């Protein structure tokens, strides 16, 4: 009998992507995050769909509809908590996935990497518009502050802001369009993720050593399906612990108050996963400069392949680069902490130093470390 999964037009694609795919024999748990991100996306789309069935995108009823979901809809509280904390898990996996790419030199697959950066930006946009939907205080003021950044664009800035708002302030038109965007973007993310995978399968996966693994490949199933399943168990464990025991741990208490344009919260800040970028934005005492630094903090990922100076792909055997990588990680954690603090000393100067170090590490120190390691590997050294 002819094996259906190898001949059927649709099953053949699935087979080549997830079953008979040749994979390096030595990829570690750091390679789990791609599949975990796929699972996160599916969880978010499903929980989001059920939330959308009960949510109303109107300024008068949005806040009440979220309360109604949590109080009156069967398991509505669970669906909402899974969706809100699922976003945090999504970003946790995203940051680890990008970090893995930087550490092991996966960015040298340029198409895969660039699509990945576009994916990151799209997920960030989705999370931002989604945070506005409950129409709490932080939703409203977060939307006001972040959309206002567009006004820093010379000449067309103010027109652009009013175009995004659909009026002269964040109001009903803004909420309605943000809901529409929040509904459509995850499907665009799904399409981009498929393209991401398509480009990855053109080259095959990288591996911790950074050496071409073609001479030693194993089938994806059962070896990596079982490994991914273990990662999934951990993901679900953490997500359920968060959603069931401390669902509001990562949220802002201000969002329990309905949006009020006449009352500004004392500290306007985004969700934890945007705090590092928010800290960089605030560290420059100029509107346009801050916006450019904010954009640069993410878009810098696009030029990382151009800054690769080392003869070795991975950092596995490069201790100087490793040290700088972990300094960068600590620096990002510091920026995340600063982003959640009020704008006063000593937080201002710490934020400015951390922002400077962030760009210095990526643009100068890490490429120099690569060159130094090349020199140290020469036999005459």
From Swiss-Prot:
A ubiquinone binds at residue 201. GO terms for biological process: mitochondrial electron transport, ubiquinol to cytochrome c. Its cofactor is heme b. One of its GO terms (molecular function) is ubiquinol-cytochrome-c reductase activity. Its main location: mitochondrion. Heme b b566 binds at residues 97, 196. Keywords: Electron transport, Heme, Iron, Membrane, Metal-binding, Mitochondrion, Mitochondrion inner membrane, Respiratory chain, Transmembrane, Transmembrane helix, Transport, Ubiquinone. Binds 2 heme b groups non-covalently. It is found in: Mitochondrion inner membrane. The keyword Electron transport applies. It holds the Pfam family Cytochrome_B. The chain crosses the membrane at residues 33-53, 77-98, 113-133, 178-198, 226-246, 288-308, 320-340, 347-367. GO terms for cellular component: mitochondrial inner membrane; respiratory chain complex III. It is a multi-pass membrane protein. Heme b b562 binds at residues 83, 182. Signal peptide: none annotated. PANTHER family: CYTOCHROME B (PTHR19271:SF16). Belongs to the cytochrome b family. Component of the ubiquinol-cytochrome c reductase complex (complex III or cytochrome b-c1 complex) that is part of the mitochondrial respiratory chain. The b-c1 complex mediates electron transfer from ubiquinol to cytochrome c. Contributes to the generation of a proton gradient across the mitochondrial membrane that is then used for ATP synthesis. Heme 1 (or BL or b562) is low-potential and absorbs at about 562 nm, and heme 2 (or BH or b566) is high-potential and absorbs at about 566 nm. The cytochrome bc1 complex contains 11 subunits: 3 respiratory subunits (MT-CYB, CYC1 and UQCRFS1), 2 core proteins (UQCRC1 and UQCRC2) and 6 low-molecular weight proteins (UQCRH/QCR6, UQCRB/QCR7, UQCRQ/QCR8, UQCR10/QCR9, UQCR11/QCR10 and a cleavage product of UQCRFS1). This cytochrome bc1 complex then forms a dimer. This is Cytochrome b. It comes from Dasycercus cristicauda. The gene is MT-CYB.
């Amino acid at each position: 009998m002819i094996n259906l999964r190898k001949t059927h037009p649709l099953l053949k694609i699935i087979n080549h992507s997830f079953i008979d795919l040749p994979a390096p024999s030595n990829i570690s748990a750091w390679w789990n995050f791609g599949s975990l991100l796929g699972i996160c996306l599916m969880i978010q789309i499903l929980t989001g769909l059920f939330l959308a069935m009960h949510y109303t995108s109107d300024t008068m009823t949005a806040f009440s509809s979220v309360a109604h979901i949590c109080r009156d809809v069967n398991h509505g509280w669970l669906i909402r908590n899974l969706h809100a904390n699922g976003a945090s898990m999504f970003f946790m996996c995203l940051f680890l996935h990008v970090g893995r790419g930087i550490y092991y030199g996966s960015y040298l697959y340029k198409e895969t990497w660039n699509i990945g950066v576009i994916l990151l930006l799209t997920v960030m946009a989705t999370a931002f518009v989604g945070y506005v939907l409950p129409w709490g205080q932080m939703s409203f003021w977060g939307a006001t502050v972040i959309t206002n950044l567009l006004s820093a664009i010379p000449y067309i800035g103010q027109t652009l802001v009013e175009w995004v708002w659909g009026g002269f302030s964040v109001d009903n038109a803004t909420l309605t369009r943000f809901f529409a965007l929040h509904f459509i973007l995850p499907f665009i993310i799904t399409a981009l993720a498929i393209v991401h995978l398509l480009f990855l399968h053109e080259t095959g996966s990288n591996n911790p050593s950074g050496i071409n693994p073609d001479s030693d490949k194993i089938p994806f199933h059962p070896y990596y399906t079982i490994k991914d399943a273990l990662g999934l168990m951990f993901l679900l464990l953490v997500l359920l612990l968060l959603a069931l025991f401390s669902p509001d741990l990562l949220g802002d208490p201000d969002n329990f108050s309905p949006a009020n344009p006449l009352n500004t919260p004392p500290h306007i800040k985004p969700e934890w996963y945007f705090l590092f970028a928010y800290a960089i934005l605030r560290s420059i005492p100029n509107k346009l400069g801050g916006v450019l630094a904010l954009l640069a903090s993410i878009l810098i990922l696009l030029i990382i392949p151009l800054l690769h100076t080392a003869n070795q792909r991975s950092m596995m055997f490069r201790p100087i680069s490793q040290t700088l990588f972990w300094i960068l990680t600590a620096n990002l954690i510091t920026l995340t902490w600063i982003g959640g603090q009020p704008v006063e000393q000593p937080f201002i100067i710490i934020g400015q130093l951390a922002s400077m170090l962030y760009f210095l590490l990526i643009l100068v120190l890490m490429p120099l470390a690569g060159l130094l390691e090349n020199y140290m590997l020469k036999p005459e050294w």
